[in-house]
Swiss-Prot record:
Pfam family name, one: Hydrophobin
Organism: Pleurotus ostreatus
Record text on subunit structure and interactions: Self-assembles to form functional amyloid fibrils called rodlets. Self-assembly into fibrillar rodlets occurs spontaneously at hydrophobic:hydrophilic interfaces and the rodlets further associate laterally to form amphipathic monolayers.
N-terminal signal peptide: 1-26
Principal localisation: secreted
Gene field: POH1
Tissue spec: Expressed in the fruiting bodies but not in vegetative mycelium.
Taxonomic lineage from the root: Eukaryota, Fungi, Dikarya, Basidiomycota, Agaricomycotina
tRNA processing recorded as keyword: no
Protein name: Class I hydrophobin POH1
Function: Aerial growth, conidiation, and dispersal of filamentous fungi in the environment rely upon a capability of their secreting small amphipathic proteins called hydrophobins (HPBs) with low sequence identity. Class I can self-assemble into an outermost layer of rodlet bundles on aerial cell surfaces, conferring cellular hydrophobicity that supports fungal growth, development and dispersal; whereas Class II form highly ordered films at water-air interfaces through intermolecular interactions but contribute nothing to the rodlet structure.
């Protein structure tokens, strides 16, 4: 009878320990639409910060409201090797066109782990 109680206590303690151990996520964030971009900022296309670069590309202000968020001054983020997953500004997943990295359309900010 005593051994059954000991077994039950040990089993319960093991289950609690397994639940209490934190799990770490070591997966690299990924972007299904292309490379992760490291941008100086991600702004609404209608913001004053994006107005200048978009105007330089010939995007009319009325059309800017259709673009959503844009990445400004972006470069592809390396996920392998030296400096992997390091972006000192804003990492973003972008679905639209890239204009020499100055402006990237259709961006959403992401958090690097």
């Amino acid at each position: 009878m005593f051994s059954i109680r000991i077994s039950t206590v040990v089993l319960a303690a093991s289950a609690l320990l397994a639940v209490a151990i934190p799990m770490t996520n070591t997966e690299t964030p990924q972007c299904n639409t292309g490379p992760i971009q490291c941008c100086n900022s991600v702004q609404s296309a209608t913001s004053s910060a994006a107005a200048g670069p978009l105007a330089a590309l010939g995007v009319l202000s009325g059309i800017a409201s259709l673009l959503g968020e844009v990445g400004l001054d972006c470069s592809p983020l390396q996920v392998i090797g030296v400096g992997a997953n390091s972006c000192s500004s804003q990492a973003a997943c972008c679905t639209g066109n890239t204009f020499n990295g100055a402006v990237v359309l259709g961006c959403s900010p992401i958090k690097l782990l």
